[in-house]
Amino acid sequence: MWKGADTSFPFADSHATTYSVRDGSDWETTLKPRLRERLRNSKNIVLVLSSTTANSRAVREEIDYGINDQGLPVIVIYPEYDSKESLLANGSLKQPVKSLWDRLPIFRDSMSKVPTLHVPMVKVAIRDALSNTGFMIATKCNPDYYWYKT
């Protein structure tokens, strides 16, 4: 979306680092190993979380392996929120935002192990998050929930 139109946008698609797989590929012998290889070569996980996010086997595996095995920080993008302020109530994440975590129980239950940065679907906020060294594996900050203050 933004990466193609803005070459300065700090996003590297880890899916492009391994060769493609076909829809009919076997989960255990092809898909799961490729997903894990991508995660081992990643500096963080970018999770787009909304009311329509599916708790699929691939998403569960990516979150579980990425957080619980690799310790990757997570940048959570909420497409249903369009400003930093819209995520917050009284300086903290709103309950409807936190309720979205229930869409992915493995994320909800594991996210306290790594730094997680919560941002709205706003280009500048996402750019700041992707450039923030506290949310990169080699330089990550302490495990906690983070968001940009308004």
Report each predicted region and the residues it spans:
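C-terminal interaction surface of TIR/SEFIR-family domains
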Residues: 26-29, 84-150
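Conserved TIR/SEFIR loop-to-helix hotspot centered on a Trp-containing motif
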Residues: 52-69, 86
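An exposed acidic His-Trp-rich patch
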Residues: 75-77, 89-90
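Conserved beta-strand segments of the P-loop GTPase G domain that flank and frequently precede/overlap
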Residues: 47-51, 77-78
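A short helix->loop->beta-strand "cap" motif at the edges of active sites that frequently abuts
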Residues: 69-75
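Conserved N-terminal substructure of TIR/SEFIR domains
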Residues: 1-41, 139-150
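Class I S-adenosyl-L-methionine
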Residues: 80-82
